[in-house]
Amino acid sequence: LGGYPIIAKPDQGARGQGVRVLGDHDDLAQYCIDQPNPFVLQRYHPGPVEVGVLWIRHAQTITEPASPAGFIYAINKKDFPEVVGDGKHSIRQLILKHPRHRAQAHMFVRRMGKQQHQIPAADERVPLGNFGNHAQGAMFTDGQDLITPELSQRIDAIADGFRDKHGRGFDIGRFDVRCVSYEALRRGEDLGIVELNGLTSEPTNIYDPNRSLRWAWRTMLGYWRHVETLAGARIADGSGEPITKKEAWDMLNDFLRAMSR
């Protein structure tokens, strides 16, 4: 993994629960004690930029492999939570005064520990988290302006590297990507894939507070239409089959259990 720091996360999890940055062997040993379920370790990418890139295969490539592989349906920027000091108020007070962070004040205060009582200097930026997850305080905004031919080509190549146990290609999902800058992202350079979410992922740009509810629903409906089209193409080609009601129920129960941890 290239040495510490490294990332530890539950093998089955959601909303950033159980994710930690481990700085040394002692941190890893403690994580093994604290985490009762199977977990994975991965290389740490410092960013500082993180985005979610939702990629969808063109349905015709299922039967016509020579066709262009897929396209970026949506992309969202992830703004990590922070407060800005005024030289008067403590970090705790700044959190409680913040129009957004006060809704998750309990989490931020617990995370900051004793540091919550420090008074940052005027204009000093204090990070409250470094995980690109809504539930961990990150704010998602639409990043359609980041989509370029270079980035699309790079994501196509990455998606092409995935195969299931039957040798079938990857069809749809969201890559959570870290990189050094938006400029590097547009060029498709120096990307670090921190997570890949499959069919149950979503176009997380729908959570942009500056976008309307109607726009969000239109984006989701478009996503579901693509899912339906791909499923139909797989079934027609014989490379896929519908799941049974029992399988659907088991998947739902697994999801609900993961969300309740």
Where would I find each of the regions flagged by the language model?
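A short catalytic or substrate-binding loop motif that flags glycine-/basic-rich loops and adjacent residues
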Residues: 12-13, 45-48, 169-171
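Phosphate-binding site of ATP-dependent enzymes
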Residues: 23-146, 150, 154, 158-163, ...
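A short linear hydrophobic-aromatic micro-motif
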Residues: 4-8, 38-42, 174
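Hydrophobic alpha-helical segments
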Residues: 158-165, 199-203
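Glycine-rich phosphate-binding loop of ATP-grasp-fold ATP-dependent ligases
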Residues: 5-28, 50-52
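C-terminal active-site "lid" helix and adjoining low-complexity regulatory extension at the edge
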Residues: 170, 180-261
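Substrate-recognition/cap regions that form aromatic- and gly/pro-loop-enriched pockets
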Residues: 165-167, 171-178
